[in-house]
Regions:
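Conserved catalytic/switch belt of AAA+ P-loop NTPases
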Residues: 28-51
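Domain-level recognition of nuclease-like catalytic cores that cleave nucleotide substrates
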Residues: 358-404
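Conserved P-loop NTPase "ATPase switch" module shared by AAA+ and STAND
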Residues: 1, 8-22, 26-28
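Accessory nucleic acid-recognition modules appended to NTPase machines
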Residues: 133, 140, 145-311, 315-318
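Catalytic cores of nucleic-acid endonucleases
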Residues: 328-371
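Interdomain motor-coupling "hinge/lid" segment immediately C-terminal to the ATP-binding subdomain
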Residues: 47, 53-195
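Structural motif
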Residues: 320-322, 350
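Short glycine-/polar-rich loops that comprise or flank the Walker A/P-loop
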Residues: 39-41, 78-83, 298, 347-350
Length: 404
């Protein structure tokens, strides 16, 4: 590792140049195009999401959000020279790898999903056990390492207590003074927002008398830091999900399931591992589904009407809008049943329900064990366009003109 007056960097002969915390050192960033054109080295530059989202130091050395397009001014990298790759905590599949689950085992799960056949009993039981461990621990590498190396949930608690302190410290360090108390209030309110029967995020539940005008920038800061993620209400059950979303009606989930569990404190991890989830189990397993979708790079949507009709999540799956219901145990929500009875009204052909099941199908409803969430293929459908034969069009044009 080498240091200069500007930045810390590491020169790797086989890889290239690694720059740490790139947004703390804006001036050398302008050299990226020159090094790229030179062709001898690749550059890997790390930085926080706050930097990527345009939060930077102003002339008073305070962190502020700058207008889009002016994030770094003359210190920005020209378009075409930079590819931003967002990193996430471990998802459940990566957690399985960390627990020495090999591809043969995962391929059995994939086969059972594709063929819609039950998972063999021994594998099914083991996967449920590992899923509950993932819910209790989350995907932060330090927490997963503590579990793998010691098997001691007390060590996992210590890691998460430290992480929560660091997150709250960053809220003070990198935010405007006027936003600091509001950011913490929004963050601390997440568990009680999810504990409500109606999980719509309500500003009045952040603090007594709270209003969006005071907190909306603070909630945006938390989302830009990838601490939380909003799940927007869609006014119809159809595509495109983004186009049908209602901007000011949303739920809020933590970006990693382990963070929500850590915020609940006490004996929550032990309760999860023992199956004693109590009244909060619905919120935990909804957040687990959000965790899965977030780490697949998906935006979050749900459906709710004033009548109380609600679907936990809406996803684009195999070219269709598909509702997802998430249950900690074996049950089915009334709303899910109502919409299944009226497919012509809601335009829904297929439904997916995750819960304490093995793989099964009941007509339009695919029931899956919760541990299979990570297997959903949410990549955009591949569209290959036919080549237009311009030579043939030219021939046709000439024939047409010759007739005139």
């Amino acid at each position: 590792m080498q240091e200069s007056g500007y930045l810390r960097f590491q020169l790797l002969q086989e890889v290239g140049i690694v720059i740490l915390q790139r947004y703390n050192f804006p001036h050398p960033i302008t050299c990226f195009p020159c090094v790229n054109d030179d062709g001898r080295y690749d550059i890997i530059a790390t930085g926080s999401l706050l930097g990527v989202q345009g939060y930077g130091q102003d002339e008073k050395k305070q962190w502020t959000r700058k207008p889009i397009g002016q994030e770094r001014g003359s210190n920005s990298v020209p378009v075409g020279y930079e590819q931003i790759v967002e990193m996430y905590p471990l998802d459940f599949e990566e957690f399985l790898w960390a627990n020495n689950m090999n591809e043969e085992i995962i391929n059995v799960l994939k086969h059972c999903l594709e063929e819609e056949t039950p998972v063999p009993s021994g594998i099914h039981v083991a996967m449920k056990t590992l899923l509950y461990r993932y819910v209790a621990v989350g995907g932060m590498p330090a927490a997963v390492n503590a579990l793998i190396e010691t098997g001691n949930m007390g060590k996992v608690n210590d890691v998460w207590n430290s992480l929560l302190k660091e997150y709250r410290s960053d809220m003070v360090k990198y935010a405007d003074d006027k936003d600091k108390p509001h950011i913490r209030a929004c963050f601390n309110a997440v568990p009680k927002q999810l504990a409500k029967e109606n999980k719509k995020y309500q500003w009045s539940k952040v603090e007594s008398g709270g209003r969006g005008v005071y907190y909306k920038d603070s909630l945006q800061w938390l989302e830009d830091a990838d601490i939380i993620r909003r799940c927007y209400n869609s006014n119809i059950t159809g595509l495109p999900l983004e186009g049908n979303a209602i901007d000011n009606v949303f739920k809020v989930y933590t970006a990693d399931i382990g963070m929500l569990v850590a915020m609940l404190g006490g004996t929550t991890r032990a309760d999860i591992l023992q199956g004693n989830l109590g009244g909060f189990k619905g919120a935990i397993f909804e957040n687990l589904m959000a965790d899965t979708l977030i780490k697949k790079g998906q935006s979050l949507y749900y459906f709710q009407k004033d009548s109380g009709l609600e679907l936990d999540f809406l996803i684009r799956y195999k070219g269709e809008c598909v509702p997802i219901e998430v249950k900690a145990k074996s049950a089915q929500a009334k709303s899910f049943s109502t919409i299944r009875k009226h497919p012509e009204k809601y335009g829904i052909k297929h439904f997916i329900k995750f819960g304490d099941y093995n793989v099964g199908r009941d007509g339009d409803l695919l029931t899956l064990p919760t541990y299979m969430q990570f297997l959903l293929d949410l990549e955009p459908e591949e569209v290959i366009l036919e080549t237009i034969d311009t030579d043939e069009l030219t021939r046709m044009a000439r024939e047409f003109l010759d007739q005139k």
